[in-house]
Each structure stands twice: as structure tokens, then as C-alpha cells.
Amino acid sequence: MTTSLPFVLANHGFALNFNVFETNLINLVLVIALLVYFLKGFLGGILERRREAILADLKDAEERLVTASKALEEGQRELAQAKSTAEKILAEAKQRADLIREDGEKRTIEEMARIKQDANANLNAEAARVIEALRAETARTAIDKALAALPKRLNDAKRAELIDRSIEALG
């Protein structure tokens, strides 16, 4: 059953009722006025408490923001100090490593020089021993040859003269 707007207007009519008593307008105004009067304090109290809670939350949030900002600044300061300390430690470590490397190089050079001196001393000692051995062998060979040739070269007169000179040299 569909009814159209023109049908409703034609049969029932459309009009505004301005009769205050029939429309309950007075009752509505009274009820609304009483609700506003009595609920004003109730709703106002609720809204005031809510406002105070929001303000307290805002104040707490601001305090936490200030605290967090201070903590952040302190953390950044400590981070900068830690970076500075780390850079100093790194620089000292590099310097110490360079000193250790230089000391190691110096000790290596000194040890090489000492080994070279020891080798030269050993070589000189061995050369002196070989020279002494050669001298002794040469002297022994010369003495042997001289002793072998001596009987052929010496006669009795020269032998006696040699003995006399040797005795005088000793004596």
C-alpha cells in the first residue's frame, strides 16, 4: 500500500497547530527549563571534573616532556663525552701501537747489528785460528825442511859454531 504525498495532503491536510495547550508546548518548556536548571550543576560538575582531569593530564604530560627533554640532553651530553673519550682512547692506542712498532723495529735492528757483530767476531776468530794453524804448519814444515837440509849443509866446524852461538844466546 503505497500512498503518495499528494494523496496524504488532499485527505488529511497539512497545517501547523499554534494552540499552546493542545501541543503541550508549555509542558515541554517547563520540562526543558527544569532539566536545564537541575542538570546544569550536575553536568557542570561532570564537565568541571573532566576539565580538571584533562588539565592535570596535560600538566603531567608537560612535566614528563620536560623530564624527558632533560634526560635527552643529559644522554646527548654523555654520548658526546663517550665519543670524545673513545676518540682519545683510540688516539692513545694508535700512538702506543706506533711506539711499540718503532720499539720493535729498533730492537730488531739492534739484534741484527749484534748478530752481525757476533758473526764478524766469529769470522775473525776463525780466520785468526786458521792463520795461526797455517803459521804453525808452515813453521813446522820449514823446520822439518831445515832439519832435513841441515845435515847436508853443516860440517863439523859449522855445527860447533852454531852450538856455541846458541849457547851464548841462551846464556
Swiss-Prot record:
UniProt xrefs under Pfam families: ATP-synt_B
The UniProt record lists the keyword Transport: yes
Alphabetically ordered keywords of this record: ATP synthesis, CF(0), Hydrogen ion transport, Ion transport, Membrane, Thylakoid, Transmembrane, Transmembrane helix, Transport
Molecular function GO terms recorded: proton-transporting ATP synthase activity, rotational mechanism
One Gene Ontology cellular component annotation held by this UniProt entry: proton-transporting ATP synthase complex
Listed CDD domains: ATP-synt_Fo_b
Membrane-topology annotation of the record: Single-pass membrane protein
Keyword Signal carried by entry: no
Origin superkingdom: Bacteria
Membrane-traversing stretches: 26-46
Subcellular location: Cellular thylakoid membrane
Assembly behavior: F-type ATPases have 2 components, F(1) - the catalytic core - and F(0) - the membrane proton channel. F(1) has five subunits: alpha(3), beta(3), gamma(1), delta(1), epsilon(1). F(0) has four main subunits: a(1), b(1), b'(1) and c(10-14). The alpha and beta chains form an alternating ring which encloses part of the gamma chain. F(1) is attached to F(0) by a central stalk formed by the gamma and epsilon chains, while a peripheral stalk is formed by the delta, b and b' chains.
Sequence similarity: Belongs to the ATPase B chain family.
Its job: F(1)F(0) ATP synthase produces ATP from ADP in the presence of a proton or sodium gradient. F-type ATPases consist of two structural domains, F(1) containing the extramembraneous catalytic core and F(0) containing the membrane proton channel, linked together by a central stalk and a peripheral stalk. During catalysis, ATP synthesis in the catalytic domain of F(1) is coupled via a rotary mechanism of the central stalk subunits to proton translocation.
HAMAP family linked to this entry: ATP_synth_b_bprime
Name this protein carries in UniProt: ATP synthase subunit b
Protein source organism: Synechococcus sp. (strain RCC307)
